[in-house]
UniProtKB/Swiss-Prot annotation:
A zinc finger (unnamed) spans 3-34. It comes from Clostridium tetani (strain Massachusetts / E88). Negatively regulates transcription of bacterial ribonucleotide reductase nrd genes and operons by binding to NrdR-boxes. The lineage of its organism: Bacteria, Bacillati, Bacillota, Clostridia, Eubacteriales. Its cofactor is Zn(2+). GO terms for molecular function: ATP binding; DNA binding; zinc ion binding. HAMAP family: NrdR. This is Transcriptional repressor NrdR. GO terms for biological process: negative regulation of DNA-templated transcription. Belongs to the NrdR family.
């Protein structure tokens, strides 16, 4: 591991422990040249997941795309970046645990909407309007009615 301070290639591990989510290992290292300490993280490389788009094209799962879409839907709403990251973590974990290598974009969209519905209904409707391509105000009203009926 290359030292970030002096670029020397050898170091020793001073401390090693699992992270809270148990999907990576945090290591404290000490450079054998300059003696400075730094932290590294090791993560198991997962099998790449392909997303099948509506037009049947395939592309690699892109976590940032999901995060950015959710940020837009949650803009000026009481939803923190941390909440968004946690939702995406849960979705990514669910897909990885299913042991499938291809997943439809519709499935991912439904998972996102399911999570948003529970934390902020306005963000949910915003996301759904883009994802489901609402054509007019009536489509919005139908979705809002479903939310209201759910509360009763």
């Amino acid at each position: 591991m290359k030292c970030p301070y002096c670029s020397y290639n050898e170091s020793k591990v001073v401390d090693s422990r699992s992270t809270e989510d148990s999907i990576s290992i945090r290591r404290r290292r000490e450079c054998l040249e300059c003696g400075k300490r730094y932290t590294t993280y090791e993560k198991i490389e997962s099998v790449p997941i392909l997303v099948i788009k509506k037009n049947l094209n395939r592309e690699y799962f892109d976590r940032d795309k999901i995060v950015n879409g959710m940020i837009k839907a949650c803009q000026k709403r009481p939803v923190s970046r941390q909440q968004i990251e946690e939702i995406v973590d849960e979705i990514e974990k669910k897909i990885n645990n299913s042991m499938i290598t291809e997943v439809k974009s519709e499935y991912i969209g439904e998972l996102i909407m399911e999570k948003l519905k529970d934390i902020d209904e306005v963000s949910y409707v915003r996301f759904a309007s883009v994802y489901r391509q609402f054509k007019d105000i009536n489509t919005f009203m139908e979705e809002i009615k479903k939310l209201k009926d759910r509360e009763l």
